[in-house]
Curated annotation (Swiss-Prot):
Residue numbers on the Extracellular membrane side: 22-53, 104-118, 183-198, 298-327, 383-584, 641-645
A Gene Ontology molecular function term of the record: dipeptide transmembrane transporter activity
Compartmental location: Apical cell membrane
Domain notes: The extracellular domain (ECD) region specifically binds trypsin.
Transmembrane segments: 1-21, 54-74, 83-103, 119-139, 162-182, 199-219, 277-297, 328-348, 362-382, 585-605, 620-640, 646-666
A Pfam entry, by short name: PTR2
Keywords, in A-Z order: Cell membrane, Glycoprotein, Membrane, Peptide transport, Protein transport, Symport, Transmembrane, Transmembrane helix, Transport
Catalytic activity: a dipeptide(out) + H(+)(out) = a dipeptide(in) + H(+)(in); an L-amino acid tripeptide(out) + H(+)(out) = an L-amino acid tripeptide(in) + H(+)(in); L-alanyl-L-lysine(out) + H(+)(out) = L-alanyl-L-lysine(in) + H(+)(in); L-alanyl-L-proline(out) + H(+)(out) = L-alanyl-L-proline(in) + H(+)(in)
UniProt record, GO biological process: dipeptide import across plasma membrane; protein transport
Protein name: Solute carrier family 15 member 1
Intervals, Cytoplasmic compartment: 75-82, 140-161, 220-276, 349-361, 606-619, 667-708
Family label: Belongs to the major facilitator superfamily. Proton-dependent oligopeptide transporter (POT/PTR) (TC 2.A.17) family.
One Gene Ontology CC term in the entry: apical plasma membrane
Length: 708
């Protein structure tokens, strides 16, 4: 029996307030952390796109495998309340460890702004994520069921409304966290150097998880807490195992066949349990194709976020971060669920179309497939604008003439003529082994060979200002600038060292005819102040303005002098800004969200309606398992494919889901809907009749024999 004090508010148990707040905070914590994860792997730890995607989906798969463990612990050992509290503690510790792992200064022993022992950060990250997966997955099947336990008989209406509020809390937590945590990430923090503030962005979700735990424990005295009733899932597994073994033992032709393979369990298990398991396995069979949907759906947080990093986030007056695009899904879900229930489905019914649950799920798969076709189209547009960076056995070189006369630079197979204060036409790519000689010449001057050990896999700028005066500068950018920022470096063509301030950042002691390192800036124009002790006249304006910076570009500013002796800026583009707008992702998010509404929500309703009353948790665990398998599919396909073009991977996933969609439609065509309540009622009637017969026999007085 459940034990609690009787508290109520507007006909609802007061205890559900604590459960709803707990769920909101927990979902904020989970989705806030998850929104950052792919960029944390890519930019902080430094993994490439494929490895980052693989680890991300491994983590998500674990989060959906551990609910089975949570259900087992709750049903057969601790009960729901103690399971939620215990695993929430594990969850909170995991979030805290992940936040600590992202502290840049933790291993920055030489204080240069870069972690000196990445393995420490990786190890802490993996420990933290493992604890989070155990915590979030373990409590997943318990919290909503624990909320449902708080209602009395006759409160079905309030219970149904509770689940609607509960679902709203999930989406509200997801929506707010995916807006807030990327905003925290773009701030800069650190002791020795200012870097993207992952500790704050991970720390806030960790704090919210602690709040979630505290709120849940505060309501302890108001909850109905039921003792574990035994492990239904264990009974199901044992019954299926016995049926298979018994069938194998009686496989010879001398034993008559039985109508269903589960009927081979009748020697040990009662017909009611066998009938219930038949209903469950019938639905589980339909689950087989479902993981393919989740394989596509969960790439919103990995591949689609990485896609957004190469796009422009300027949408009207808004500046959208790549990981904030995931909020489109949460916003559309909150809007579309009531629209589908109140408008779309009733209209379809009025048109006389029997839009069954399985038909809806088929449509959901098709829409998700089309979402990935849209993603591929967007990717093709992005690819047209992306710079090509050198491979491991290549180098890229461009020539920048900061002198007063034209210069000729000869490379193997090419001669480049660069006029004064201009650059060659972009970066030229050379195989390291074939880059045998580079020579500089100009009219009336001898040929001067360039001697420099070019580092393969990197870009280089060859600064020239006279035939015998040159400098090779290794560029520090081998990818688009992160977070949609803009990389800016300065080249000093004057004969003295300069200090340069741009916005709130300082370039200290940029020596003569040399380049600074890149520093990164947000959108807009910035003031540039040049400090000099000799060459620049005091009468000159030393505050200049940059160009209007956009998303994801890189520029070199060469500081020269006008005829008046005053400084002037010459701007050269190193990496062009992102031109494909993130708004182009909205159609693919719209399609995937439509697919989610008609697939996921309908799938849960279908599973609930087709499951026996005591086995709904078994089907819930099976449903969550399809999500885990879907993420494993991403690992297999992405790992085996190794596509050179991302759009091709999107098309592959779309094609796979389309094939699965057809298979599922055929399976659904032959599925017969059942009413578990009617079947169980029939068993109840049969048991009642048998009991009545037994009572009749027990009331007959036996005839006693007289002893002679």
């Amino acid at each position: 029996m459940g034990m609690s004090k009787s508290y109520g508010c507007f006909g609802y148990p007061l205890s559900i307030f604590f459960i709803v707040v707990n769920e909101f905070c927990e979902r904020f914590s989970y989705y806030g952390m998850r929104a950052l994860l792919i960029l944390y792997f890519r930019r902080f730890i430094g993994w490439d796109d494929n490895l980052s995607t693989a680890i991300y989906h491994t983590f998500v798969a674990l989060c959906y495998l551990t609910p089975i463990l949570g259900a087992l612990i709750a049903d057969s050992w601790l009960g729901k309340f103690k399971t939620i509290v215990s695993l929430s503690i594990v969850y909170t510790i995991g979030q805290a460890v992940t936040a600590v792992s992202s502290i840049n200064d933790l291993t920055d022993y030489n204080k240069d702004g870069t972690p000196d022992n990445l393995s420490v950060h990786v190890a802490l990250s993996m420990i933290g994520l493992a604890l989070i997966a155990l915590g979030t997955g373990g409590i997943k099947p318990c919290v909503s069921a624990f909320g449902g336990d708080q209602f009395e008989e006759g409160q079905e209406k309030q219970r149904n409304r509770f689940f609607s509020i509960f679902y709203l809390a999930i989406n509200a937590g997801s929506l707010i966290s995916t807006i807030v945590t990327p905003m925290l990430r773009v701030h800069e923090c650190g002791i020795y150097s200012q870097k993207a503030c992952y500790p704050l962005a991970f720390g806030v979700p960790a704090a919210l998880m602690a709040v979630s735990l505290i709120v849940f424990v505060i309501g302890s005295g108001m909850y109905k807490k039921f003792q574990p009733q035994g492990n239904v899932m264990g009974k199901v597994v044992k019954c299926i195992g016995f049926a298979l073994k018994n069938r194998f033992r009686h496989r010879s032709k001398q034993f008559p066949k039985r109508e269903h393979w589960l009927d081979w369990a009748k020697e040990k298990y009662d017909e009611r349990l066998i009938s219930q398991i038949k209903m469950v396995t019938k639905v589980m069979f339909l689950y087989i194709p479902l993981p393919m949907f989740w394989a596509l759906f969960d790439q919103q947080g990995s591949r689609w976020t990485l896609q957004a990093t190469a796009m422009s986030g300027k949408i009207g007056l808004l500046e959208v971060q790549p990981d904030q695009m995931q909020t489109v899904n949460a916003i559309l879900i909150v809007v579309m669920v009531p629209i589908m229930d109140a408008v779309v489905y009733p209209l379809i019914a009025k048109c006389g179309f029997n839009f069954t649950s399985l038909k809806r799920m088929t449509v959901g798969m098709f829409l998700a497939s089309m979402a990935f076709v849209m993603a591929a189209i967007v990717q093709l547009e992005i690819d047209k604008t992306l710079p090509v960076f050198p491979k491991q056995n290549e180098v890229q070189i461009k020539v920048l003439n900061i002198g007063n006369g034209a210069m000729n630079v000869s490379f193997p197979g090419a001669v480049v003529t660069v006029s004064q204060m201009s650059q060659s036409d972009g970066f030229m790519t050379f195989d390291v082994d074939k880059l045998t000689s580079i020579n500089i010449s100009s009219t009336g001057s001898p040929v001067i060979p360039v001697t420099y050990n070019f580092e393969q896999g990197h870009r280089h700028t060859l600064l020239v200002w006279a035939p015998n005066n040159y400098r090779v500068v290794k560029d520090g950018l081998n990818q688009k600038p992160e977070k949609g920022e803009n990389g800016i470096r300065f080249i000093n063509s004057l004969n003295e060292s300069l200090n340069i301030t741009m916005g709130d950042k300082v370039y200290v002691n940029v020596t003569s005819h040399n380049a600074s390192e890149y520093q990164f800036f947000s959108l807009g124009t910035k003031n540039i102040t040049i400090s000099s002790t000799q060459q620049i006249s005091q009468n000159c304006t030393k505050v200049l303005q940059s160009s209007n910076l956009e998303f994801g570009s890189a520029y070199t500013y060469v500081i020269g002098t006008q005829s008046t002796g005053c400084p002037e800026l010459h701007m050269f583009e190193d990496i062009s800004p992102n031109t494909v707008n993130m708004a182009l992702q909205i159609p693919q998010y719209f399609l995937i969200t439509c697919g989610e509404v008609v697939f996921s929500v309908t799938g849960l309703e279908f599973s609930y309606s087709q499951a026996p009353s005591n086995m709904k948790s078994v089907l819930q665990a099976g449903w969550l398992l399809t999500v885990a398998v879907g993420n494993i599919i991403v690992l297999i396909v992405a790992g085996a494919g190794q596509f050179s073009e991302q759009w091709a991977e999107y098309i592959l996933f779309a094609a796979l889901l389309l094939v699965v969609c057809v298979i599922f439609a055929i399976m659904a065509r032959f599925y017969t809907y059942v009413n578990p309540a009617e079947i169980e009622a029939q068993f109840d009637d049969d048991e009642k009749k048998n009991l009545e017969k037994m009572n009749v026999y027990s009331t007959v007085t036996p005839v006693s024999q007289t002893q002679m």
